């Protein structure tokens, strides 16, 4: 009888300790399953924007510069550039669509020559088709984009802390970070547009003469626009999750609370 009481007390003690650990874990988490699911959905939306942002900043298809096709020549030249480097390509005119007056698109196969911009290291301006970049504007666009990525990474860290540690106060911080990163990316895109216009206007007087150019924005810049908008939308979702539930509960009452 004594041994049975001892084992019974030991079993009760273990069950009580396990229950306290579960209660402590739930109190530390602080998120109901429903609320945790909403946070994960908003984080998934922000992750899509983050992926597009990294893809946009890391690629060099922000803008394409196209020369006009020359009569009697089998090749023509085009270029595409981003925040970090520029690539010039020699394309076969037979591969260029017949309805185009200019060389391109830059995705066509051809002999490519890609170089990183030197104003990040030596401070020199780059020359593309006898035109000179304005390094101050290009540097500003790149720095703003990198700041946007850094703030975006901080926002991801805040939301991960919310899900793992239950620190709900970081929801608001994460929302601010994602919103700020989206704004910074959009500002970087606008600054880059000004750098393209400055490049087209800074024609070198040295021979040979600069060719006529047309330009068109490419898919990397489109990814940046989409990333900025999605990050802003994700920030709005996180901000909605920080609001108290009673205004929404009064507008959308639960079906179970009906008058009998």
Curated annotation (Swiss-Prot):
A single cellular component GO annotation: voltage-gated calcium channel complex
Q: In which tissues is it expressed?
A: Detected in heart left ventricle.
UniProt keyword terms in alphabetical order = Calcium, Calcium channel, Calcium transport, Cell membrane, Ion channel, Ion transport, Membrane, Transmembrane, Transmembrane helix, Transport, Voltage-gated channel
Q: Which Gene3D superfamilies does the record cross-reference, listed alphabetically?
A: 1.20.140.150
Q: Which domain of life is it from?
A: Eukaryota
Where is region (Disordered) located? Answer: 14-33
Membrane-protein topology: Multi-pass membrane protein
One protein family per Pfam: Claudin_2
Q: Which residues cross the membrane?
A: 43-63, 143-163, 169-189, 221-241
**One GO biological process from the UniProt record?**
regulation of calcium ion transmembrane transport via high voltage-gated calcium channel
Family label? Belongs to the PMP-22/EMP/MP20 family. CACNG subfamily.
Q: How does it assemble?
A: Interacts with CACNA1C. Identified in a complex with the L-type calcium channel subunits CACNA1C, CACNA2D1 and either CACNB1 or CACNB2.
Q: Which PANTHER family match?
A: VOLTAGE-DEPENDENT CALCIUM CHANNEL GAMMA-1 SUBUNIT-RELATED, VOLTAGE-DEPENDENT CALCIUM CHANNEL GAMMA-6 SUBUNIT
What function does the entry list?
Regulates the activity of L-type calcium channels that contain CACNA1C as pore-forming subunit.
Q: What protein name does the entry list? A: Voltage-dependent calcium channel gamma-6 subunit
Q: Which organism is it from?
A: Homo sapiens
Write the gene name. Answer: CACNG6
């Amino acid at each position: 009888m004594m041994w049975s009481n001892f084992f019974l007390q030991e079993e009760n003690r273990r069950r009580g300790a396990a229950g306290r650990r579960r209660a402590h874990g739930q109190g530390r988490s602080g998120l109901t399953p429903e609320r945790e699911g909403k946070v994960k959905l908003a984080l998934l939306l922000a992750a899509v924007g983050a992926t597009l942002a990294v893809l946009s900043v890391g690629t060099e298809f922000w803008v394409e510069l196209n020369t006009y096709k020359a009569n009697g020549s089998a090749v023509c030249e085009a270029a595409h550039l981003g925040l970090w480097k520029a690539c010039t390509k020699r394309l076969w005119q037979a591969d260029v669509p017949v309805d185009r007056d200019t060389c391109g698109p830059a995705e066509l196969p051809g002999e490519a020559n890609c170089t990183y911009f030197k104003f990040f290291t030596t401070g020199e301006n780059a020359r593309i088709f006898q035109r000179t970049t304005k390094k101050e504007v290009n540097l500003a666009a790149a720095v703003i984009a990198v700041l946007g990525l850094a703030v975006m990474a901080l926002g991801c860290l805040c939301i991960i802390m919310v899900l793992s540690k239950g620190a709900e106060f970081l929801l608001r911080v994460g929302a601010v970070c994602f919103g700020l990163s989206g704004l910074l990316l959009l500002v970087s895109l606008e600054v880059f547009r000004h750098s393209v216009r400055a490049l087209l206007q800074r024609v070198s007087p040295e021979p040979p003469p600069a060719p006529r150019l047309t330009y068109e924005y490419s898919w990397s810049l489109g990814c940046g626009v989409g990333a900025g908008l999605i990050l802003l939308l994700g920030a709005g979702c996180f901000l909605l999750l920080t609001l108290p539930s009673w205004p929404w509960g009064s507008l959308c009452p639960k079906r179970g609370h009906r008058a009998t």
